[in-house]
Amino acid sequence: MKAATVRLNVLSDSIGSEWSDIDAAGEAYASLLESRLQQSAGEAGFDTEDISVTYHSSLAGYSTDSVWADQLEAEEQLQDIVRNTRESAWIEFCESNSTL
């Protein structure tokens, strides 16, 4: 297994205003994204114990996103996984949660 650390933030202003409950939408999207990231990273041979996504309803108290692996090539692969998974999870979320 390749070592990996991923810390991502979902901010309320990035969710958009079309949801009736922005906080519920943010929490649901963060949960979906974390699950999909763990799945995709695990399939690529990364340890998934240190992957987390946190929703923040305000800009206070959040840190910058962080993607780290113990080798440069692995880190580049992990960054690609994060980018692709973030996009596909957002599409999946929007298509399946139009009632939030």
Regions picked out by a protein language model, each given a short descriptive name:
Residues 1-19:
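Short, extreme N-terminal segment that most often corresponds to the first beta-strand
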Residues 16-21, 69, 73:
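Short coil/turn segments at secondary-structure junctions
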Residues 7, 36, 83-86:
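Arginine residue identity/basic-tract feature
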Residues 4-5, 31, 61, 70:
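Intrinsic disorder/low-complexity segments
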Residues 19-43:
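Short, flexible N-terminal segments of the mature chain
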Residues 47-100:
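Polar/charged, Gly/Pro-rich intrinsically disordered segments
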Residues 16, 24-26, 83, 87:
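Low-complexity, compositionally biased segments
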